[in-house]
Amino acid sequence: MADENGGIFMPKKYNTIIIGGGTAGLTAAIYTARQNKSVAVFENGIFGGQIADSPRIENYPGFCEISGDEFSDRLLKQALKLGAELIKKRAAAIKLEGKDKYVISADGEKTQCDKIIIAVGTRPRPLYLENERELLGRGISYCAVCDGAFFKSKTVAAVGGGSSALQSAKLLAELCKKVYVIHRRNEFRGEQRLCEELKSFHNIEFLLNSEIKKINGKTRLESVLVKNNLSGEETVLQLDGLFVAIGKEPQNEIFAEVTELDENGYIKADESCKTSTDGIYAAADCRTKAFRQLTTAAADGTVAALSP
């Protein structure tokens, strides 16, 4: 490879490159660095991952309670202390040349390694309704922790039935005048303790067996059309904010050429985190697995780093 002066140089080579700087990625970096192996972590967003947005973590062993921001910060500092290198770039592709592996960043730079661990996590699943994308950031959000404060003393809705949706609803209820909690089923899938906590808020109204069918607004969110799936009744809710927390979906499109994906877009990997391609591993939420929790993300990061 020639440099700008016509000379020849080799791209920097690491033992391991990790794509994704969340819990799994940073755990893998910690374990790789502790083996005295060179390791770099590619992350275009926030090092620490989506858990940094969680106001409170209560289900990670050893911590009765810790904020997501503090948890992520501790992981990051530990990885750095052990010698992991952080590369604030988006990994755009993986290129295989014989036994050589390269991660290509969005700016076209190639970084060589012997082993790749994919730990990109997932992205919020949208409602897939007209106007949703256009009004994102204009009343629609996928992160109550990030954006909830903008809606203080206003009327909002939280959509979803898992723990993330319930946590969002609780945070919003502490800030907002009125919070509608919209869920398509009759019961919530989230932690029962959270459900009981929400019932104590006088400003929360539950709309169960209900779905949003239409989003209204030109330059900002104005209202949503909600349909009760049992009665068929439709109601228009005037809203200042809509917080969507209906789960996650994979973001593995760029890896489809070098790893096998399942029918839902998750990377096929066994319990050693090995993919269909030698030397490429997939850890945590981006891979096929039964459970996607903070603890299983850390476990996958460990396994992927230690697997030969």
Predicted features and spans:
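A short, basic/flexible loop-to-alpha-helix module at the beginning of a structural domain
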Residues: 2-13, 141-150
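A Rossmann-like FAD-binding core segment of flavoenzymes
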Residues: 6, 79-105, 110-111, 173-271
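Phosphate-coordination loops involved in phosphoryl transfer and adenosine-cofactor binding
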Residues: 13-15, 88-89, 152-154, 209, ...
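Beta1-alpha1 glycine-rich phosphate/pyrophosphate-binding loop at the start
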Residues: 14-82, 160, 164-191
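Glycine-rich, N-terminal phosphate-binding loop of Rossmann-like dinucleotide-binding domains
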Residues: 21, 120-121, 246-247
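Glycine/small-residue-rich loop that forms an oxyanion/phosphate-binding "nest" at active or ligand-binding sites
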Residues: 86-150, 161
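FAD-site-proximal beta/loop scaffold in flavoenzymes
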Residues: 128, 134-150, 246-296, 300-303
